[in-house]
């Protein structure tokens, strides 16, 4: 989705993330080093998930007094660490640039044109088509059904703030899609955005 915006020249991979999200995103150990969109997408931003990643507040100095813990000791673009918050930030940037909610943009601009069934909003999907998830319970030594994994997000969506509430859809990996349709998506991805 971000690369569609890059191709349309609506955004640059070298842009300062701070300008795109609306608050300062800087590793306090390297305050003069700009963190770019490219660094987010390649997990080289020096950001970590230690303060959480279900809210952008984790990294926002105005919202979290411990925001500095969200950064690693290495300079941005000098190391690699997988970080979910990177992609939640990217999803928020997508919303700010397009004015379209993350899940709806993915649906309209990627899934629907490819004829794929899936999405990031569990409220819009047929629950009968979603596999049930089980978690291992150590106390009972059994696997127990975990209904919260795909719980509706009705309240969160009703209170949604564009460019800020994006993590509820989990741009980090919250896509619900069949293996067949995911394979179709990956073919398109491997062919630089073209399918068939």
Predicted regions and their residues:
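Short, glycine/proline-biased beta-turn/loop segments that scaffold the active-site neighborhood
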Residues: 12-28, 113-114
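Glycine-centered, phosphate/nucleic-acid-interacting loop/turn motifs that mediate DNA/RNA or nucleotide
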Residues: 9
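Short, surface-exposed loop or secondary-structure junction motifs
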Residues: 28-196
